[in-house]
């Protein structure tokens, strides 16, 4: 099967203050691929995610970000979202006064919005996939009455409803109290079956091994990319060197 490039990051350099966080990162994500990014704390994983999404304050000083064949380096977050890209934050936001069912409807794929019954069915399916009982959560508010883990699950449910071309997931298991990683993997597989590509920022070996491809970032550079187990073994052997090279930061 011929692979089709969805995202291509070329020679990406990003500064935060006076410090260079990303130092010439090169990365690709193919259509319908799960690509995991691993590395020590402070290596630049989250900075890469925020830069690709176009978050304010993460403007590259050099490099290109090609999405669907278009250089989006000068496009803002809204424009990138309209092109089919989304980001699930490591720390999900609160939305005072918005019920879960309305929040999930906001970014829902238009093909489901056309019919109210289909939309409601999709919302229920999404909540069940993230292990939340629809009857208990549909009319809850996305505010401080929900735990961080519950809001994280709702964020994942939102992406399930959205079915974007590219979902960037920053530590998708963070704050979620789970016995195993099977439910997160189930979300990954569901989205992939729907034709979505995933760029997953994680430090969990269990999630990285579920990816099609893994890239290791160390001190702002991608130092190895390829088979999940091969990259994982390389990281275990070289992780001490990586930690020594990484300053404080994201």
From Swiss-Prot:
ABC transporter domain span: 7-244
Disulfide linkage: none
Entry-linked CDD domains: ABC_FeS_Assembly
GO MF terms held by the record: ATP binding; ATP hydrolysis activity
Entry annotated with the keyword tRNA-binding: no
Lineage top rank: taxon: Archaea
Residue ranges of the TM segments: none
Pfam entry (one): ABC_tran
Keywords per UniProt: ATP-binding, Nucleotide-binding, Transport
Residues binding ATP, per UniProt: 39-46
Family: Belongs to the ABC transporter superfamily.
Name under which the protein is recorded: Uncharacterized ABC transporter ATP-binding protein MJ0035
């Amino acid at each position: 099967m011929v692979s089709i490039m969805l995202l291509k990051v070329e020679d990406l350099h990003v500064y935060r203050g006076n410090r260079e966080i990303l130092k010439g990162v090169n990365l690709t994500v193919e259509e319908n691929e799960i690509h995991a990014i691993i590395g020590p704390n402070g290596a630049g994983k989250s900075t890469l995610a925020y830069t690709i999404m176009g978050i304010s304050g993460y403007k590259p000083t050099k490099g290109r970000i090609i999405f669907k064949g278009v250089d989006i380096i000068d496009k803002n977050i809204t424009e990138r979202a309209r092109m089919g890209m989304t980001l699930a934050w490591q720390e999900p936001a609160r939305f005072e006064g918005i019920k879960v069912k309305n929040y999930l409807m906001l970014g829902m794929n238009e093909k489901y919005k056309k019919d109210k019954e289909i939309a409601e069915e999709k919302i229920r399916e999404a909540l069940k996939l993230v292990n939340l009982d629809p009857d208990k959560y549909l009319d809850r508010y996305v505010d401080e009455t929900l735990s961080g883990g519950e809001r994280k699950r709702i964020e994942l449910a939102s992406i399930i409803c959205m079915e974007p071309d590219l979902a960037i997931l920053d530590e998708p298991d963070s704050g979620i109290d789970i016995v195993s990683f099977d439910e997160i993997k189930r979300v990954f597989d569901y989205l992939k079956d729907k034709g979505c590509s995933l760029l997953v920022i994680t430090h969990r070996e269990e999630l990285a091994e579920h990816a099609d491809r893994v890239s290791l970032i160390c001190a702002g550079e991608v130092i190895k990319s390829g088979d999940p187990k091969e990259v994982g073994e390389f990281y275990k052997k070289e992780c001490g060197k990586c930690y020594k090279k990484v300053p404080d930061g994201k």
